[in-house]
Amino acid sequence: MRLIPLKNDEQVAKWSAQHIVDRINAFNPTEDHPFVLGLPTGGTPLKTYRELIKLYQAGKVSFKHVVTFNMDEYVGLPKEHPQSYHSFMYNNFFNHVDIPEKNINILDGNTPDHDAECRRYEEKIKSYGKINLFMGGVGVDGHIAFNEPASSLSSRTRIKTLTPDTLIANSRFFNNDVSQVPKYALTIGVATLLDAEEVMLLITGHQKALALQACVEGAVNHLWTVSALQLHRHSIVVCDEPATQELKVKTVKYFTELEAYAIHSVI
């Protein structure tokens, strides 16, 4: 595992966006051989999307031959609802770059057969061979996508019941009314994430400090979904200083020295 400890969330956004661009350009994608990118929603990746848009506008990258798969979507929320993850992705990213509509993949939370939709999604991913890079965020309790604490580390795309903590956390997007937050979501599984060639998690803010500690210093534990990243052969955690508050000083020092070149690339 690589840990990139940066000063603030602005640096996290710049570093992660540049890393995605570098990976896409090094891959040299074509229509017949596209780069496959996994994407999250939520507050943490917003600044990364803004940086990606800037890099696209500056001519540093094209998304014409990039295929995307999003992590999750609420069940029962219309696609056009302002808080659906469809709306989030189009408003904050897809509408601002040159990605073809046919290359965008987001789970359909309104399908009558959720199990069939989840199987279709897994099969679609496999049709491309693998996801080349999956970017993700992490919840306060260490969940990735909607893989809540105690999710199976061998899980695949499926329907999940959201925990009370997640409902409360997400109520800020629904006028702080928990009753308006969908109770279920379709989500990729932990094993789906770990199948990706590379996984990059963004962890920012002091409220995520325990999750970062579980990810880097803790044992692999299904109660901390994020700890499964330790099992991945090519994983990167990009974090800011507030998120490192629960890490041992020597841990931060070790990775700061180890990743000195990567860190200075955004300073």
UniProtKB/Swiss-Prot annotation:
PROSITE patterns, per the entry: GLC_GALNAC_ISOMERASE
A molecular function (GO) term: identical protein binding
Active-site residues, record numbering mapped to chain: D72 (proton acceptor), D141 (for ring-opening step), H143 (proton acceptor), E148 (for ring-opening step)
UniProt cross-references to InterPro entries, sorted A to Z: Glc/Gal-6P_isomerase (IPR006148), Glucosamine6P_isomerase (IPR004547), Glucosamine6P_isomerase_CS (IPR018321), NagB/RpiA_transferase-like (IPR037171)
Membrane-traversing stretches: none
Keywords, alphabetical: Allosteric enzyme, Carbohydrate metabolism, Hydrolase
EC number, as in UniProt: 3.5.99.6
Reactions the enzyme catalyzes: alpha-D-glucosamine 6-phosphate + H2O = beta-D-fructose 6-phosphate + NH4(+)
PANTHER family linked: GLUCOSAMINE-6-PHOSPHATE ISOMERASE
Assembly with partners or alone: Homohexamer.
Name of the protein in its database record: Glucosamine-6-phosphate deaminase
Native source organism of the sequence: Mannheimia succiniciproducens (strain KCTC 0769BP / MBEL55E)
